[in-house]
Amino acid sequence: MALLDFFLSRKKPTANIAKERLQIIVAERRRGDSEPHYLPDLKRDILAVICKYIQIDPEMLHVQFEQKGDDISVLELNVTLPETEETPK
């Protein structure tokens, strides 16, 4: 009887398979594999505020976003300050 069921069973429609694959892709993206869309603007704004007080090279500012678990996000900010103080321009 199992052999008969094998040949008479219907395959899943391709629409259902595509839907399942899309749900997997969306779930992976929500998991935090990519950085937030606002991160470049945030980095630019932070650099502007720092430059009001001390002149630094934009390459000396590093911003990193990490997703830890479902409800914890970490924003790490590293600024390399020059050894001598310069007045802002």
UniProtKB/Swiss-Prot annotation:
GO terms for biological process: division septum site selection; regulation of division septum assembly. It holds the Pfam family MinE. Disulfide bonds: none annotated. The keyword Cell division applies. InterPro entries: MinE, MinE_sf. Signal peptide: none annotated. One of its GO terms (cellular component) is plasma membrane. Prevents the cell division inhibition by proteins MinC and MinD at internal division sites while permitting inhibition at polar sites. This ensures cell division at the proper site by restricting the formation of a division septum at the midpoint of the long axis of the cell. HAMAP family: MinE (MF_00262). Belongs to the MinE family. This is Cell division topological specificity factor. It comes from Yersinia pestis. The lineage of its organism: Bacteria, Pseudomonadati, Pseudomonadota, Gammaproteobacteria, Enterobacterales.
